Amino acid sequence: MALRFPRFSQGLAQDPTTRRIWFGIATAHDFESHDDITEERLYQNIFASHFGQLAIIFLWTSGNLFHVAWQGNFESWVQDPLHVRPIAHAIWDPHFGQPAVEAFTRGGALGPVNIAYSGVYQWWYTIGLRTNEDLYTGALFLLFLSAISLIAGWLHLQPKWKPSVSWFKNAESRLNHHLSGLFGVSSLAWTGHLVHVAIPASRGEYVRWNNLLDVLPHPQGLGPLFTGQWNLYAQNPDSSSHLFGTSQGAGTAILTLLGGFHPQTQSLWLTDMAHHHLAIAFIFLVAGHMYRTNFGIGHSMKDLLDAHIPPGGRLGRGHKGLYDTINNSLHFQLGLALASLGVITSLVAQHMYSLPAYAFIAQDFTTQAALYTHHQYIAGFIMTGAFAHGAIFFIRDYSPEQNEDNVLARMLDHKEAIISHLSWASLFLGFHTLGLYVHNDVMLAFGTPEKQILIEPIFAQWIQSAHGKTSYGFDVLLSSTNGPAFNAGRSIWLPGWLNAVNETSNSLFLTIGPGDFLVHHAIALGLHTTTLILVKGALDARGSKLMPDKKDFGYSFPCDGPGRGGTCDISAWDAFYLAVFWMLNTIGWVTFYWHWKHITLWQGNVSQFNESSTYLMGWLRDYLWLNSSQLINGYNPFGMNSLSVWAWMFLFGHLVWATGFMFLISWRGYWQELIETLAWAHERTPLANLIRWRDKPVALSIVQARLVGLAHFSVGYIFTYAAFLIASTSGKFG
């Protein structure tokens, strides 16, 4: 018999039903569950696949550069970044005739194009690229890296080049390599690029390979470095009248601590960023020399963790046993990596708009909105993934004997207290926040807006004041004009910071009031509830009072049959599934808040947000309905416009989202009956019955249907909001 899909599971390959296909797809990447897998092959497969992942990333980024160089308008955008719309790529086949062609021919293009809202133009401009040739060179270089990655992946699957398990478990060498080799050296290299290429470009000097060795990035060269006069590199920075990309108002400093923003580009000073990357490089290069490898000096991770036993005895045996637990569990390591990456991605979202690093990106409002929303959604998915793999760790890899009375075991011992506290916090936040919103809503409805309960966020305002915001009138720390910190800040460090905090043209420490107080607590409710579901899923993954033997059923089981009541919907997978809905819900509130606050800021009518955000109808009417009006315009006698594609995507997103409920609310029996009826009809229909199938069609399992429903719900939700966000922002600001 020929080998059938899936080859990695003979049990599944022999399944006579369509379950074979779905279960095969579902377990294709669960290497641990494959036939004849060994620990060594598991590690080697994952290692090789990382190179494939890198190849895809390099190919994708190469494609961005290539298409902009080929079909974009980078060179004309560089001449006038604030008024030329950046083109992502051409549209080959604009449907709906001449009106469509006219609607999408923009940005000085000859034919229909897509506008770029990703910020790549601003990024490339900031780092010193100026011509299409530069973009092509970058695309070719990334294509080369992609090919190298593919070759490396293939190579590490060959017998002679397969690393051993001991190599993968050498934690100290990996730490040193990642800290020094990846973070340290790459940060140092980036500092080099900024100093040698980007900063000269911002001052009108074009540095390329042909003159790299001739142009001194600083008039005194390396002299100050070797003589210890490092402060010379900070002297004579660009002036506040500097025109970016020209020598007008330019200085000679390369490593500064100016603080605040370049007045023209509204982005951080390039010389500050070079300084930042140099500091990061130094820290990581040192960190990457701290762990004991071949030379018998430095820290041993195992010794470090075993020594972490709090003397008071409150944490039992502390971190004893954790080294082997983490080092032998890929799921634990992945959980830690995802948790870190999730936090970082959300921090990127928060910092990209408040401290914009790229020239002129702060004035490209649609790009700002798109990047914030994009990074928050990515962060949400990564964070839920961290808990999912944490739960799989508890089911597949956790050993009670190895972790006796350490912090991990004590987490499990105290899980009732942890879960009930999260539950209490969620209930408190939910009822109080909803109570305030509903009360205010009713007061507005009955025509007595003065009876709203409006709470001023005084603690948050105090924190903003401590960082230098003076408008609230708190005389504290950096907002205290006669304090030592304030005076030092004027001269010694970051003199531009206090100006930036108190300017109204940027997004640093936006002025906040009762509407912010309420939505902050709504978001806190979402975060705590999502966390509650995820933490409960992981801590109850091995078992609970209701189902003590849960770990024997694996990560995702629907129920333990009809004989055990209450065992449905309590697998660790179900917790992940439910948490994703809450995660999407929470990020919805986060992005609504960010977008509405910024639209009113950019339009100069902040009072709209301040007055309408304190009650539910305000959010529904003045944010959602008002901003979606262009998208629900429908057919009109004026034909197409450049927002039509977003209007279509808005509709289509709703369709995909609603389709999710078909999978989420109806279950197997209904579909099984329908499938059997359709199969009967198929077999009796001329021509159609020439096509036969070997697998008996069966309905999706409960868990699979949930996954398909969740996927449609998520994709539709994000499509809908993306269309709304981009259309409502670009429709207002062009």
Curated annotation (Swiss-Prot):
GO terms for biological process: photosynthesis. The keyword Thylakoid applies. It holds the Pfam family PsaA_PsaB. P700 is a chlorophyll a/chlorophyll a' dimer, A0 is one or more chlorophyll a, A1 is one or both phylloquinones and FX is a shared 4Fe-4S iron-sulfur center. It is found in: Plastid, Chloroplast thylakoid membrane. Phylloquinone binds at W671. Keywords: 4Fe-4S, Chlorophyll, Chloroplast, Chromophore, Electron transport, Iron, Iron-sulfur, Magnesium, Membrane, Metal-binding, Oxidoreductase, Photosynthesis, Photosystem I, Plastid, Thylakoid, Transmembrane, Transmembrane helix, Transport. It catalyses: reduced [plastocyanin] + hnu + oxidized [2Fe-2S]-[ferredoxin] = oxidized [plastocyanin] + reduced [2Fe-2S]-[ferredoxin]. Chlorophyll a B3 binds at M662, Y670. One of its GO terms (molecular function) is 4 iron, 4 sulfur cluster binding. Gene3D superfamilies: Photosystem I PsaA/PsaB. The chain crosses the membrane at residues 46-69, 135-158, 175-199, 273-291, 330-353, 369-395, 417-439, 517-535, 575-596, 643-665, 707-727. It is a multi-pass membrane protein. [4Fe-4S] cluster binds at C559, C568. GO terms for cellular component: chloroplast thylakoid membrane; photosystem I. Its EC number is 1.97.1.12. Chlorophyll a B1 binds at H654. PsaA and PsaB bind P700, the primary electron donor of photosystem I (PSI), as well as the electron acceptors A0, A1 and FX. PSI is a plastocyanin-ferredoxin oxidoreductase, converting photonic excitation into a charge separation, which transfers an electron from the donor P700 chlorophyll pair to the spectroscopically characterized acceptors A0, A1, FX, FA and FB in turn. Oxidized P700 is reduced on the lumenal side of the thylakoid membrane by plastocyanin. The PsaA/B heterodimer binds the P700 chlorophyll special pair and subsequent electron acceptors. PSI consists of a core antenna complex that captures photons, and an electron transfer chain that converts photonic excitation into a charge separation. The eukaryotic PSI reaction center is composed of at least 11 subunits. Belongs to the PsaA/PsaB family. This is Photosystem I P700 chlorophyll a apoprotein A2. It comes from Daucus carota. The gene is psaB.
